[in-house]
Amino acid sequence: MKHILPLLVMMTCVTLPTPDSRASDPKAANEQNLRVMIQGSSGAAMRELVQSSGGTITHDLHIINAVGALLSQAQLDEVLTSPLVIRHIDDLSIGPVPPTDPDLADKSCDVGGALELSFSKAGINWTLYNKFDAPAVLQQLALSWPEQLGTIASMSLDGAPVDPGMLTDTGAGSLNVEFGGLARPTLEGKGDLALRFKPAPGAPDSISLRQRDFSAKADFAGDCTVKLIPGYDANHEDFYYAGVSGADALHLHGVTGKGVTVAVLDSGLWDHDLLTRDTAGDNRVLARYDAIDNRVVEQLFDASGHGTHMTSVLAHSGATTRAGIPTGSFKGIAPDVNLVAVKAFNVEGQGGFLDIVRGIQWVVDHRETYNIRVLNLSFGARPRWPYWLDPIDQAVMRAWASGITVVAAAGNDGPEPMTIGSPGNVPYIITVGAITDSWTPQDRDDDYIPDFSSRGPTPEAHIKPDLVAPGGHITGLTRPGATLTEEHPEYLLSTGEFVMTGSSQATALVSGIVALLLQLEPDLSPDDVKCKLISSAEPAINADGLLAYSPFEQGQGLVTATRAVTLGNKGCGNAGLNITRDIAGTEHFQGPATIDDGGGVSLPGLNNMVSAQPSEQGLSTRRKWGVKAHIERLTHSLDPNQPSAGSPFNWEQAYIEEKAAIEALSRP
């Protein structure tokens, strides 16, 4: 069944690097060339070897002591005779085929429904999109609406009236009809499902309506179902995730990321004032670098739209309003950050790993020039090598070691274990999974980790993700006409924003929180930033005191900006690891996870920590997020010396310590 919202556009390393003309050999060009990466004692030494063989340098990658090159087989053989070469990768011309959407496999139907319903006392219009060439045939329709609106007087699909005889069984507030034979309505392309009501006797003249008062489910031939989502009220005024994550409270105190630069390595940036300018209207894009063409540019065209959406989540400078009145908060998490936009992904959202490494290298090389403190990596691919051998992971580790806090997506390949992507598998960085708020931002009891969010451990047994953050149906700006909007027109709001779901969005949100922390404490190291986030995250806890999700699903729990500021610790980030030795190759690190012969994953004592019953997808009467919510729902008296029976965790003691810390902060 087609997901209600699109998942993260996973950016796998599939495009090929384009050679430059700085060193070329006409004879070699006539042979079948290989696109390779040569790694060795230094980038300069590798360049000299390639050039002396007559090959073409495509990428200077000194950050990992490597070059990308275009070589014939004979030239490659010559280069590899040198003892200076440590490693080469010669299959860059054979990229993996982009995965097909499993929801569309062997299907003859693909219909999407607009996120917004047009409704009034007179009737409703719901726009549907048939993305296949053949007409989509409606088989069954289930609707509900406020009873005060009366009964269905008429219905049409794509302008064609539905036989009134099919509507005879409708009652006040509901309709469930099966269409058969020639009476089945059809949809070609874009069309509206339109209903008109016959008012009930004595119905009030004025009725207050919200989208969540309606429900709709349409089943089309070919195993194709589309449902109306509840939606957010006044979504154009409030994107809600700044409030859910606690960023709005910091905005009210002037904490907006001012003075901190975040680099977003993605598909580019649409030059929209609410993205390129801060809350004061000042330009805040310090540089735009195209890692595909290896040049600094004035405009970084975003054909895909993904990079613009990530930047919007992170830095949208538009004010949050209520009934048109500014609240003092903003739609983006860090609306005053400075930005560096780096493009390494194409119109399809695909990127070659040499371009990605070059993009990371440019960020590290210009860290001091632009005060780059955060690097957002909302992409991933299945790991091909251990983290210390993966070229992207190697560059990411060097970025972290240089003082840049790197935040990466866990991926959208869940719910199976060991689905964390690269570079999210790097143990040092902050890896983010996703939760959804089920369209109820004020109610945390229905917040859950959706199946798509990738799970750990990593192949090297490290616990990932590190934490989870809001990533469901995230509103933001993207370029009109971008690939995303063309492929998913149903996720465009009438006010121009675009709604996406995935760990990409959760990652951009966390990058924004990191910028808020660094504005308050600019001397924080990346390790201490990570410590503040994971030590203050709120785990999902069941009523029996056991974890609702394993650490491979939720990491340390749900991140909150206010808790990171008030309760976050230092000194716990990457304890037991040594990035200097890791980069030097003198020591590499395995995590604590165990993996049995059947592929089962665990941790020492995990069975005693996590509930055996799967956590509900939606409203839960058992699950609470955070120690405070868990303890305050209990009926027994609070005694830190007698923790919850059957639980290895002393949540009572943790509650007392958190409360004391908050009270200490409130004292003058």
Question: What label would you give each PLM region?
Answer:
Residues 119-135:
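Short beta-strand elements of extracellular/lumenal beta-sandwich folds
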Residues 239, 321-322, 370-476, 535-537:
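Catalytic-core segments of hydrolase enzymes
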Residues 249-287, 296-354, 368-374, 401, ...:
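Subtilisin-like serine protease catalytic core
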Residues 266, 284-285, 424-515, 519, ...:
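Extracellular S/T/G-rich loop segment that most often corresponds to the catalytic His/Ser-adjacent loop
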